[in-house]
Amino acid sequence: MRKVIGYAAHSASEPLKHFNFERRSVGAKDIQIEILFCGVCHSDLHTVRNEWHNAKYPVVPGHEIVGRVLSVGADVKGFKAGDLAGVGCLVDSCRVCEECADDLEQYCDNSTYTYNSPDKHTGKMTYGGYSNEIVVDEHFVLHISDKLELAAVAPLLCAGITTYSPLRHWKVGPGMRVGIVGLGGLGHMAVKLARAMGAHVVLFTTSPDKAIDAKRLGAHEVVVSKNDNEMKPYAKTLDFILNTVAADHNLDVFTALLKRDGTMCLNGVPEKPHPSPSVGNLIFKRRQLAGSLIGGIKETQEMLDFCAEHNITSDVEIIPIMEINEAYERMLKGDVKYRFVIDMATLKSE
């Protein structure tokens, strides 16, 4: 075991604070990574405050990890000390089920999440990236390009793959009209990725003041979704919609925008269920309502390579670890464009 430091929540009502804990020793197939940057995902906040009712304290959040390899186990073939490396939402899975065989580890019933998940190696809970180091099986470690700003790459490990995977699954590309609902951490990545894939991108937002920024990010059109007059011309015009909004809202407003055989995919996990959608709205145009969860390791690497090729990163605000509690409060107010990233060097000076 190796002693490390991090930031943890010890209850739903306490702020995160300095935490000393241990990582497992480096095994034959493991990679030890010095964490340079860790993105701040809204899932971190949900878990810390036990809004999904599954937190096991203490919680060390963080699943958007970019770092540098410190050491590798004897059987590791794809990495060496000094390499850049990334870790996303998963650190293990069963490796034998149909989902794992199809490189869809995120759907494995026995997958292990990067934090707040039972660790098969230690018997304890996993601890995430708000830390100076992490040890992960090589299969779940990703290659990071040195062509991109590392801090801005970190959110790709969650926000990037969470939006890339459904866009790829539903074959978004040239000639398609694609709607993106919401312009937050997920939405701004969805706009960039859909545009890079060649689609005509329509951004739907409740905030008129986001129009200029949405077009800067790559949206061809911006529609204020609470304005009925703006929404009417878009009825039955979209091939695919990626809905990134987690807050419960009326889904029928958006399914009505789909063409026959169109699909709307939900990305955001709501604290409360959405109102039930109109079945008729789906049946009479053979529309589909679907969901998608992050992405498998192979696809995550594909996404990282795609982003390096197209010079795509997240828009980030870099913060010291000491400001994480204030960052959570700002997230709740929507006061971030578009993702906080922790500079983990500040943990050493904390």
Task: Tell what function each PLM region has.
Residues 2-4, 297-350:
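C-terminal hydrophobic helical "lid"/dimerization subdomain
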Residues 24-38, 51-101, 106, 145-148:
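Glycine-rich beta-strand-centered segment in the early N-terminal region that forms part
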Residues 94-181:
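NAD(P)H dinucleotide-binding glycine-rich loop of Rossmann-like/cofactor-binding domains
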Residues 174-183, 193-253:
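Adenosine-nucleotide cofactor-binding segment
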Residues 187-188:
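N-terminal Rossmann-fold NAD(P) dinucleotide-binding loop
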Residues 258-259:
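Helix-to-beta-strand junctions that scaffold the AdoMet/dcAdoMet cofactor pocket
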Residues 262-263:
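Glycine-centered, small-residue-biased loops immediately flanking beta-strands
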Residues 269-285, 297-303:
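Rossmann-fold NAD(P)-binding glycine/threonine-rich loop
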